């Protein structure tokens, strides 16, 4: 009986991780749709734009300042940042909850981003700070097991 309970617990934890990674794939696909609109405004090269499609892959390094500028532009399209170019917690929470099963990810994602923002709060250049926050968020999402596989994003991208 005890081993059955452990099996049920492990299965529910695995389901939860898969569920949050699946929600993250929806968030990423939808958010990423605005990248082309923001490319010129942010000075993002076509090469980096193409690479961004693989944001969650191990091979993609989140280091380019222009990517931070693009993320700011993209976030502003959905009102996800305050005037001080920091995350708008309520809007981000609601944005994530707007996706299928988003409530399983919203609180964790807001917390991870906020913790990353605190680490780089002294960075005065908004684009540089945001790209550092994005890199931190990617690393922490992987650590938490909520980062989606690129194939998951590709599977849902047509919905947006």
UniProtKB/Swiss-Prot annotation:
<keyword id="KW-0813">Transport</keyword>
<comment type="similarity">
    <text>Belongs to the PBP/GOBP family.</text>
</comment>
<keyword id="KW-1015">Disulfide bond</keyword>
<dbReference type="GO" id="GO:0007608">
    <property type="term" value="P:sensory perception of smell"/>
</dbReference>
<protein>
    <recommendedName>
        <fullName>General odorant-binding protein 2</fullName>
    </recommendedName>
</protein>
<dbReference type="InterPro" id="IPR006170">
    <property type="entry name" value="PBP/GOBP"/>
</dbReference>
<feature type="disulfide bond">
    <location>
        <begin position="38"/>
        <end position="73"/>
    </location>
</feature>
<keyword id="KW-0552">Olfaction</keyword>
<comment type="subunit">
    <text>Homodimer.</text>
</comment>
<dbReference type="GO" id="GO:0005549">
    <property type="term" value="F:odorant binding"/>
</dbReference>
<feature type="disulfide bond">
    <location>
        <begin position="116"/>
        <end position="136"/>
    </location>
</feature>
<keyword id="KW-0732">Signal</keyword>
<comment type="function">
    <text>Present in the aqueous fluid surrounding olfactory sensory dendrites and are thought to aid in the capture and transport of hydrophobic odorants into and through this fluid.</text>
</comment>
<dbReference type="Pfam" id="PF01395">
    <property type="entry name" value="PBP_GOBP"/>
</dbReference>
<feature type="disulfide bond">
    <location>
        <begin position="69"/>
        <end position="127"/>
    </location>
</feature>
<dbReference type="InterPro" id="IPR036728">
    <property type="entry name" value="PBP_GOBP_sf"/>
</dbReference>
<keyword id="KW-0716">Sensory transduction</keyword>
<dbReference type="InterPro" id="IPR006072">
    <property type="entry name" value="Odorant/phero-bd_Lep"/>
</dbReference>
<feature type="signal peptide">
    <location>
        <begin position="1"/>
        <end position="20"/>
    </location>
</feature>
